[in-house]
Amino acid sequence: MEDNEYYRINISNTENYQTSENVTTEENAIISNDANEFNMEQNPVVGYSEEPLLPLVKACAPLSNILHDLSTYVEIALNETPEVPPDELTIDESAAIRLYTIEWERPHRSLYSMLNYTLKMADREALRPYFKYLKLFLTALVKIPCVPPLTVWRGVTKNLSEEFPPGTVVTWWSFSSCTTSLTVLENNMYLGYTGDRTLFSVEVINGRIIRPHSHFITEDEILLLPGTHMVVQSQLNPAPDLYIVHLKQIIPEETLLEPPFEGAELYPKIKKHWYRKKRFIIPITFMVALVIAAAIIGAIVGMRSAVKKGKFWMIFKLEVKRLL
């Protein structure tokens, strides 16, 4: 595997970060070293869900003038996809994920590179040519079960600690590839052991394992969806020039990413634990008991009242007879 192929998963390489004016050079970074991209307010990713669900070839047709030799890579992705893909995906859905993971030959930029660059742009109209592919790609991703909550890692070859004080709300607008293996990031080929480095430790709740659908089947890649919303929990500086930023994913109050189809679950369903249910059962049981107790007390009081009234009239009658 070439160096730049693994850079796609794990780190940002400042030397390879390109502007939109130089689209013929591969962007190896999946996280830009420009920290402002994490905090800038963007419009939500919406509109693509209205597109029809098309085969991969047709879904990629609007991108033929954007991505070099796209048809060749689409064919590679389809040929590598088994007839019965895992996770109950269709061939085109699985191939859409596989196409995302393929690295274009240099100096041309890959699909993941151009797509993520466009997702981080403020101009959402620039994203429109990707809508048909996004419909297929995200339909495939949401069919893959979310991994249980776990900690994943990403690395940046720059000190970004000052940009992430505790309590800061962070949104990653691109598809974000992470690894569960910290030893991968320690490899000298990627982050290395010297120079400014920032490690992001992220507690994720809706990551997807795409290894069964990846062009690189040896990569344990966890993919986060656009609009991943997080809060900075803490920071750590365990070694010179090494900074660790602890992030915790939260569900945003507003829609940042439109689901690809009606009923699609971007986040795992929250299961109510027994002790939470008990919080509601106990007050209801208590109220029912109060009503029953009140009814019993009322009946007893009524009987006593009736007894007292009966005794009064009996005495009254005896006194009347005595007087007569």
Model region roles, listed by residue range:
Residues E27-N28, N33-V74:
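N-terminal-proximal low-complexity accessory segments that begin disordered
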Residues W153, S181, V232, H273, ...:
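Conserved structural-core and active-site-/substrate-pathway-adjacent residues in large, well-folded domains
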